[in-house]
């Protein structure tokens, strides 16, 4: 039995497939989901989404931003404002993006601007986590 996973950003579905396991960071901690898991609704945090499939030795990795997860009858739907597939991570641009986001965070005078810069830093750190994982393979 497999889990049907669908990931959507505003306006479109960015990834859809079947997997054997999903690991995701929620606001209450990391959770692992296997087939026949009890139904849940959870708020997810910006982090690395890891999925495993029997068809591949390597996990499927992507960065997702804050959003929501719904699981019912082995069907997972993740709605997020941003999703970065592993193949779309530009390693050469990450350092520049990190410096820019850190500068914006440090110079932010309003809480809203600090929050947005912090989200960018979390996304960039998650990208680095994926690159680090792949470099250690």
Curated annotation (Swiss-Prot):
Protein family (similarity comment): Belongs to the ATPase epsilon chain family.
- List UniProt keywords, sorted A-Z: ATP synthesis, CF(1), Chloroplast, Hydrogen ion transport, Ion transport, Membrane, Plastid, Thylakoid, Transport
Superkingdom to which the source organism belongs: Eukaryota
Localization per record:
Plastid, Chloroplast thylakoid membrane
Q: Name one GO cellular component term.
A: chloroplast thylakoid membrane
Q: Under the GO molecular function aspect, what terms does this record hold?
A: ATP binding; proton-transporting ATP synthase activity, rotational mechanism
Q: Which residues cross the membrane?
A: none
Quick one: which gene encodes this?
atpE
Q: How does it sit in the membrane?
A: Peripheral membrane protein
> Origin organism of this chain?
Bigelowiella natans (Pedinomonas minutissima)
What is the taxonomic lineage of the source species? Eukaryota, Sar, Rhizaria, Cercozoa, Chlorarachniophyceae
| Subunit comment | F-type ATPases have 2 components, CF(1) - the catalytic core - and CF(0) - the membrane proton channel. CF(1) has five subunits: alpha(3), beta(3), gamma(1), delta(1), epsilon(1). CF(0) has three main subunits: a, b and c.
Describe the function of this protein. Answer: Produces ATP from ADP in the presence of a proton gradient across the membrane.
Entry-linked CDD domains: F1-ATPase_delta
Q: From the Swiss-Prot or TrEMBL record, give the protein name.
A: ATP synthase epsilon chain, chloroplastic
Against HAMAP family, the record matches this protein to: ATP_synth_epsil_bac
């Amino acid at each position: 039995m497999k889990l049907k996973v669908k990931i959507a950003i505003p306006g479109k579905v960015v990834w859809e497939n079947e997997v054997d396991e999903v690991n995701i960071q929620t606001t209450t901690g990391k959770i692992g989901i296997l087939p026949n898991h009890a139904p849940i609704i959870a708020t997810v945090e910006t982090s690395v989404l890891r999925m495993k499939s029997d068809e591949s030795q390597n996990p499927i990795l992507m960065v997702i931003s804050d959003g929501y997860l719904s699981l019912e009858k082995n069907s997972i739907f993740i709605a997020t404002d941003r999703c970065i597939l592993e193949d779309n991570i530009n390693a050469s641009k990450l350092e520049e993006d990190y410096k820019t986001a850190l500068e914006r965070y440090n110079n932010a005078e309003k809480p809203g601007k600090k929050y947005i810069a912090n989200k960018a830093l979390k996304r960039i750190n998650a990208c680095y986590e994926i690159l680090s994982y792949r470099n250690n393979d």
